[in-house]
Every structure is written in C-alpha cells, then in structure tokens.
Amino acid sequence: MKLTPVSAAVLSVLAASQVHAKSDVFSMEEVVVTANRIEQPVSEVAGSIAVVTSEEIEQKGETELYDALRHEPGVSVSGGAGRPQNITIRGMTGNRIMIIRDGIRSADGFGANDNNDKVGRDTFDLSNLESLEVVKGASSSVLGSGAIGGAVILKSKQPGEFLEDRDFYVDATGTYTGISNKYKGASNLAFRSGDTESLVNAAYWQGEETRNFSQDLYNRDLDGYSASYAINHFFNDEVMIKARAELYRQDQQRLEGSSSIQKDGKWHIEDFAEDESTEEYSAYLGAELTPLDPTWFEELDTKVYWRHTEVITDTNRLMNSTDANGLLIKRRELEHKTFTDSTVGLRADFKQTLHASSAEHKLAYGVEIASDYYQREDNQKALDWTGSNASQKQPFASARAYNIGLYFRDMIELEKWTLTGGLRFDAHRLSPDGQNDIGGYPLKDIDSSEISPSLSISREVFENNRVYLSYDHGYRAPEYDKAYGFVSHDFVPLTPFVIAPNMDLEAETSDSFEIGNKFDNGRAQLYVSAFYNKFQNFIDVVTTGQDNFGNYVKQYQNLHGVETYGAELSAAYAFTSSWKLSTKLGYVDGKDAEGEYVRSITPFEGNVGLNYQQQDFNAFATWNWAGSMDRVPSCQTSLGQKTECAKTEAWNTLDLGAGYQITKDFRLSATIINLFDKEYIRYQDVAGIADESKRYSTEPGRYFTVNAKYIF
C-alpha cells in the first residue's frame, strides 16, 4: 500500500523507536522479494531467489553486473567493463534469461552460440538500482515469453526511499575500481513539494576494459553517463500518479585489433580504430491505486512504457599484404554496424486478499500488451588498388513482435501449509518488417501461444523450518535472429558456410522442478535445494547439407532432450550481534539428446564469508573457490574444424574489505580482490570455446576498490 508523505513520516518515526527499544536483540535482516508478484520473505518463498541490494553494491565498490553477481552459485556473468556481459543461470544463458526493470523488459543481446558476445545485457547503470532479484529457474507463469531459464528483476530507486523523515535529500558517491581502472561519480537528489516527491539521479564514469591477469588484452577506453528523473504525486490517500524517464550512454574506443578474414589470402593489420556507442532511453507513465474500501482489488499498479536501445559500431582497418610480384599492397576496410531493440507496451497488475474456508488467499493477476521492434544492419566498404567496393548487408530481416499476456496467481495460506498456483497465457506473433524474403528464402509470420502453469507447496514442519516442492513452466517464442537470419560465412577457409532462416521454428519450453528446505530463525539460516530442468524444442544450430556453391548450410532448428540439474546450499550463522559466518555452494550439470554436455553448465563452486559489524565499522573476508571443470562439449575452431573444448583447473581466491562511518554523513569503504594475486580462469568465461583460445581469458590479479559516500 502506498502512503502519503505525512503518513510515511509518522510511521518511520514509530518504527525507529521500536528498533531502538529492541536494540538488545540481534538477528539477520529479513529480505522481502516480489519476484512472484506477491510480497514474501525470501525464507518463505518456495523456490530459489538471490537478492543483491544497492547498499551491498556501493560498499563493495561494484560498478558492473559482473561484480554484483559473482558470489552467487549457479549464477554467473561473462564479460566485464568494455565487453558485452551475458548472464547464465543454472546452465541456461543468452536470451533465455529475462531481464526486466520496473516492469519493462530489457533488450536482448546477440552473439554466436547464445554467448551475447557482440551485444550484452548490461545496458543500465547500477548506481540507480535499489535491488536485483535473481530468479533461479523458469518464471514464465509470471513474466511470460523469455523467462524460460530464469530472470533478473531490477528495481529502480524511488523518491520516498530518501524522504522518509525529510523534505530534501542529496548525496554524492565516488568509486574507483582497479579491475578496469574506472573512476565513477554518482549523485541522488530527492525533494518533496506538498504531495509530490521527485528523484534525480546522475552518474558519470571513465575507465578501461576489464583486464586479465597478464594485462595483454587489446586496450579499450570507455566513458559513459546515465541520468534519470522519477516523480510520484499523491493525488489522495488512494491514488498515486507516477512517471520516470531515464537515459544511459556508454562510448568505447579501441586502437588495437586484428585483420579480418579475406577471400584472397592472409592480410596483416597496419592500423586499427573502433568506436562503439551504446544508448538506451526509457520512460513510463502510470498510477498506483489502493482503495480505502476495496472491492475486487486492494492494489493496482498500471503503466504505459517505452524503451529504445541502440548499439552502433564503426570499425576502420588498414591492412597490407604482398602480391605475386612481391609488391606491398594495402586495403582499407570500413564497417558500420547498428543494432536496434525497442519496445512499447502497457501493463496492469492487481492484488487482492480474500478469506474463505479458514484459509487466506493472496491473489495477483494482470495483463500486459507489448510490441517490439528489431533491426540490425551492416554496411561495409573496401578501398584498395582495384578501387572502391561498397556493400550493404542486412544479415537479419527487420522484424516486429506482438505479444499479449494474461496471468493469475493465488497463494493460499492454511495453518502451516502454503499452496501457490499460477497460470499465464501468452499469444505471440513475429512478423518481418518490410521484407518478403532474405537470401532467397521467403519470410512469413510466425505465431505461437503458450499456457504456462506453476504450482508450489510448502509446509512449516517445525518453527522457522519450511520444506517445499515447486514446479514452473518456461516459454520463449522463436527469436527473430534465429528465424529471419541469413548470414554468409563463405569467406571462411576450408569450411565456408551460411546460416539459413527457418520459418518452421516452434517456441521453446521448459519444465522446472525444485525441492528444498529453508530454516531461518533470524540468527541461523540453512537453505538447501535440488533442481531438475527439462527443455523441449530447444533451438540450436545444426548442419543440414551444402548449397550449390559448396557452402555448408546451417540452420537453427528445434531439438529435444536438453536437461540440466544440480543442487545448491546457502547457510549463515550470527555468533553475536557483530560476527556472522556464511557460506554458499552450488553444482550444475546437464546434457543434450546426443549425450553432449550443455556448454553453459558450471563446476562445483562456492564461497565462505566472515563478516564483522560494530557500530560505525564493518569488515569482511570472503574465500571463493571452484573445482576443476572437464564436463565440456565438443567444439569447433574458427575454421570449422572439430577440436577439444576449453577445460579449467580448480582455483581459490581471498577477498578482504572494510568500511567506516566517519561521521553520520560520510562513509568510506575499500575492498581488496584476489589478495594473493592468483592466476586462474573461470570456466564460465571460456565455456564453449576451443582450448587453444583460452589463454587471454584469465581473471585479473590483485586489485582494489574504494567507495566514498557523503550525504549533504
């Protein structure tokens, strides 16, 4: 329920007095999540959800999605600053993981084998996020198409979070991280005027590409900024009007690179320059209703929204070679690439509470209508002694997608039992935009629809201990680039190939099962879970034959039999109000129908942390580790030849950190990562690449972060 500013201020004072009165009792903070549309403490959710807060991100000096999620078993992020970042959850990766922010779906990424190594999923700034919730497993019964392997739910900061007991607030935060030599400044300005609250957030950063251990990667300089404005107007005790607008931009420059593959032999790079810009604009306008005398809903959250994401890459290569007469010849190659992903839509989410037959029903239901637009272009121009040769390619036909989703959830609480059922219907249409064919293949609309159910049951077997069993269905409509793509690689020596479109693709689906136990008495926590995921119509590339020009023809097709499974454990114990020990560990395995290991599974991994908190001072030590990884599929070289996939050795590192509240308004914290400067490779960073190509994929050596925050 939304409160007017006066009501919120009164309640905050009362809450503060209650906390002070109970200061002699200590317990770990209870985390409440909304990933299933119904607020629940994470200890009572029948499933696995990880939460990262803005306070944790600030104090550890984390500036990348990669940093924020690196301590969560079963969850990993490849890439880093200056490189596309891609999320993996329990063996599923790429666009099978949905990222949704304030109810608005984030842009897809792209890259070979779902690596998203060309465009990543990190088109947002961490400094204006309140929290990240990671749903481990299918969540299509709540979020619809795209959440087949899991979801990351981002919540932006709101004005009221800064204005509980004041009418004006401003802060400034400065961060340095040695992993990318990045300097970042950010500020929040919140103010209240009558019944209207506003929040302005701005950030600017400069740095370099995330380094490896030897610091021998091509160097990339980057700078960027983000800005947002949110406004909430309390029309009365029942209605709040809200709006938010945000922009994000990051520019990257690289003056080092390699030559591209040429059809007329080997060429050497002489000069190289690449500029890349990533821009995202988003906005929404909505209202929240909390009727004082509710009838068929207690809360309504509705909004219309828009998001536009664009990535532009310009590459300039000067190459040289020697002709048959021994003369030095040169060729300049210019390339301009664009990637566009936009969405516009509206949604309405309702909540209601009913009491019937001695049971409490917490209901959540809603509707979403959205339209997406996708476009990629590739313009090339080559200049050499033969003249100028320009070409315009569109490897993927521009497309529009239309989706409507309806969902309903009911959480029933009866004594010690909790039963939660959910159902969502999605209808989806993918249509080519302005093209009837690509590469000589005719294009057509692709329609799909799906009913995605979920069901969970949990019981409190004794005080503070709950066992649960859950089932969730996942669904993803065919992606435009896998259906409408015609990509020629006829320049590849030995094994030239083309990727052909496929108008017969069907939607991917998954069935996720999880069983677990959660104990949490405020002082001790123990969460244990085991999971199994079965995927049907899994879309992957296969070789179908050869064309009339001798090129191998590859195509994305629906496959069967992909499955992943594993187990996770999370435990914590507060010895005193100052000392806490915690540990997390996880294991993910999986194979396809041919018995090949799933590329994106992870080794046995985890961490152990010791935290100290005493009044204005806190400190922590975290030991991170992972076992060796030899459960790998077969791979291909850049020339298409079969080879051994990369394997990794076991590793462990130690991180240290401390923070001090110097005054009530000024806080300083610092972290040392990889204290003993160990060289190692995370399997997640080399999954699915040839073993011979992994030498540049080491993690950084020892580095430090510093964060300072001042509240004016």
Which functions belong to the PLM regions below?
Residues 238-246, 278-437, 447, 458, ...:
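Face-selective signature of the C-terminal outer-membrane beta-barrel domain
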Residues 176-206, 215-255, 275-290, 357, ...:
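Transmembrane beta-barrel wall of Gram-negative outer-membrane proteins
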Residues 13, 22-162, 181, 470, ...:
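Acidic, small-polar-rich N-terminal luminal/periplasmic segments of exported/outer-membrane proteins
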Residues 113-114, 127-131, 136, 141-213, ...:
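Outer-membrane beta-barrel translocator/receptor signature
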Residues 475, 534-536, 581, 627-635, ...:
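C-terminal beta-signal and adjacent terminal beta-strands/loops
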Residues 156, 174-180, 193-195, 204-208, ...:
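Transmembrane beta-strands of outer-membrane beta-barrel pores
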Residues 352, 357-358, 413-419, 428, ...:
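Gram-negative outer-membrane beta-barrel transporters
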Residues 197-200, 298-317, 466-468, 472, ...:
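Membrane-embedded beta-barrel scaffold of Gram-negative outer-membrane proteins
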